[in-house]
């Protein structure tokens, strides 16, 4: 019999909710803004279409869509996690398929496509250990927790054996597809795949292997997750071991692959030379929270929020705008410059962590603007014009559809995080025009936001939490108790709080300011 409820451990925070195999109800969003509603509804229809059964695994998973007929480890589990409120079974399957297809030596498949299960590259970005942990924690899925811990531990061992050939302790890249940076100048001249489709080997003559900051960051994020998993499973000594190993590789990334004078992370080739191209490596390293706040603040000023570099009109380009390697003109499926839907989908994993929720609002609005204007949901767009690449890139790409869905809720609805609910109140926004949001929570309650006039009414499980007028994010615990108000606009906002059981309160809140309640 499958056990789907966590055993009792000291990590009570992981025991938040019982498991659910199939969603009893799905999130609901309606608005009188016809254009926004049409884009949102089309995004959901694409995700339904892209929920398919692939060969060699018997249950439905969320595939990449467009020209990509399969599920990839670098992104598929994370995408399905974002989709979990609609299809928790698909979120689970999109993790378990990789563990079921894992080889006895620990190697995880890089993908499972219609044509084959791939082992020709490691292709990892968002750690499957991290997304599996989040899903297991949210749904109380003991079997997933145990399976993911075992599988991700074996994968770490495989990487240490076959992707640490230089003995540095950092994770090595052997080919272009290892990082999924197709057609990027970062990998110019390097074969796309490992010889004979075997990720244990690298081609000779290209100054390989490389020490890769982003692959190493993925390993770091996975080890942090493994530490939490071990603690939840009562394996205290193993939890400490994984935490120590995580700290070690983080330290190596910062000491060996960060160049302070450029405020950039670079690959180091086998000749110990940096590949000095400012690329999407940066967002991926931030995605696993490798930089501390002080280092991030420098990266933010010099690179990420610099309009000449990565803060394009439609962020974030895959190569800095002012980097001479930026590929022009833009071609299909290239990480040589365009803003990629995958990067946008991963952004919530780090913008808020580093205290940049207000600026993230701008990015979300720009992406939704581009998607609503285009309506074909393709892979990449010109960071200067929002024009989506058409020649060679097909429509109905799952990450683009997920961006539209996820950003709608993050802009003007309610979002459930690991330990809290975030109520994003944004009256007079295109997404909130006559809008209603209904979100089933992991505790089998329903969180609702209903807009009217200059604000919105908030309820949880039929109980009124209050009303907010003005633009801000109310943060509550899972039971709805208010804990903080966050400024999520770049301009100061006047906000009126009418919270149940408390006197009305007027506040002025600045960008990214956090007011305890």
What name fits each language-model region?
Residues 453-517:
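C-terminal beta-sandwich/jelly-roll accessory domains of carbohydrate-active enzymes
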Residues 69-76, 80-95, 99-189, 212-216, ...:
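Aromatic-rich carbohydrate-recognition surfaces in CAZymes
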Residues 42-49, 97, 151-165, 218, ...:
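Alpha-helical scaffold segments in carbohydrate-active enzymes
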Residues 20-69, 142-144, 153-160, 230-241, ...:
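Acidic/polar, glycine-enriched structural segments that form the non-catalytic walls/loops
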Residues 28-37, 83-95, 135-153, 167, ...:
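Structural helix-adjacent loops and short alpha-helical linkers that scaffold large soluble proteins
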Residues 30-70, 93-118, 165-210, 251-339, ...:
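Extended glycan-interaction surfaces of carbohydrate-active proteins
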Residues 5-23:
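N-terminal export signals
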Residues 71, 124-138, 261-303, 333-458:
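C-terminal capping/lid segments that line or modulate ligand- or cofactor-binding pockets
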């Amino acid at each position: 019999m499958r056990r789907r409820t966590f055993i009792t451990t000291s990590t009570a925070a992981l025991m938040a909710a019982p498991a659910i195999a199939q969603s009893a109800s799905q999130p609901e969003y309606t608005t009188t803004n016809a254009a926004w509603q049409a884009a949102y509804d089309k995004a959901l229809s694409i995700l339904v279409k892209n929920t398919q059964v692939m060969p060699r695994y018997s249950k439905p998973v969320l595939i990449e869509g467009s020209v990509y007929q399969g599920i990839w480890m670098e992104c598929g589990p994370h995408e399905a996690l974002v989709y979990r409120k609609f299809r928790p079974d698909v979120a689970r399957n999109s993790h378990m398929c990789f563990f079921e297809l894992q080889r006895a030596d620990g190697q995880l498949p890089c993908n499972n496509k219609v044509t084959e299960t791939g082992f020709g590259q490691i292709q990892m970005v968002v750690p499957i250990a991290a997304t599996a942990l989040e899903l297991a924690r949210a749904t109380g899925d003991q079997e997933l927790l145990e399976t993911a811990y075992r599988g991700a531990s074996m994968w770490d061992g495989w990487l240490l054996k076959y992707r640490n050939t230089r003995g540095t302790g950092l994770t090595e890249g052997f080919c272009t597809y290892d990082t999924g940076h197709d057609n990027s100048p970062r990998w110019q001249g390097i074969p796309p795949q490992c010889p004979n489709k075997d990720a244990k080997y690298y081609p000779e003559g290209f100054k390989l292997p490389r020490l890769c900051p982003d692959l190493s960051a993925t390993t770091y994020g996975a080890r942090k997750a493994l530490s939490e998993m071990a603690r939840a499973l009562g394996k205290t000594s193993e939890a400490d071991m994984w935490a120590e190993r995580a700290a070690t590789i983080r330290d190596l990334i910062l000491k060996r692959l960060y160049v302070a004078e450029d405020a950039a992370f670079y690959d180091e080739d086998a000749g110990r030379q940096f590949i000095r191209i400012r690329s999407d490596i940066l967002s991926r390293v931030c995605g696993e929270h490798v930089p501390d706040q002080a280092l991030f603040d420098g990266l933010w000023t010099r690179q990420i929020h610099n309009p000449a570099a990565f803060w394009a009109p439609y962020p974030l380009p895959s190569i800095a705008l002012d980097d001479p390697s930026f590929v022009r003109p833009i071609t299909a499926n290239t990480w040589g410059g365009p803003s990629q839907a995958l990067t946008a989908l991963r952004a919530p994993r780090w913008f808020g962590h580093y205290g940049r929720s207000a600026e993230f609002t701008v990015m979300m609005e720009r992406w939704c603007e581009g998607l609503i204007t285009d309506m074909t949901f393709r892979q990449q767009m010109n960071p200067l014009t929002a024009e989506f690449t058409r020649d060679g890139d097909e429509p109905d790409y799952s990450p683009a559809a997920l961006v539209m869905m996820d950003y709608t809720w993050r802009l003007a609805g309610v979002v459930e995080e690991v330990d809290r609910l975030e109520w994003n109140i944004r009256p007079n926004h295109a997404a909130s025009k006559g809008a209603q949001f209904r979100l089933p929570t992991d505790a089998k309650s329903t969180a609702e936001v209903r807009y009217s006039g200059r604000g919105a009414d908030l309820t949880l499980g039929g109980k009124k939490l209050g009303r907010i007028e003005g633009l801000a994010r109310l943060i509550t615990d899972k039971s709805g108790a208010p804990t903080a108000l966050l400024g999520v606009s770049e301009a100061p906002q006047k906000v009126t709080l009418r919270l149940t059981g408390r006197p009305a309160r007027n506040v002025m809140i600045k960008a990214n300011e956090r007011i305890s309640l």
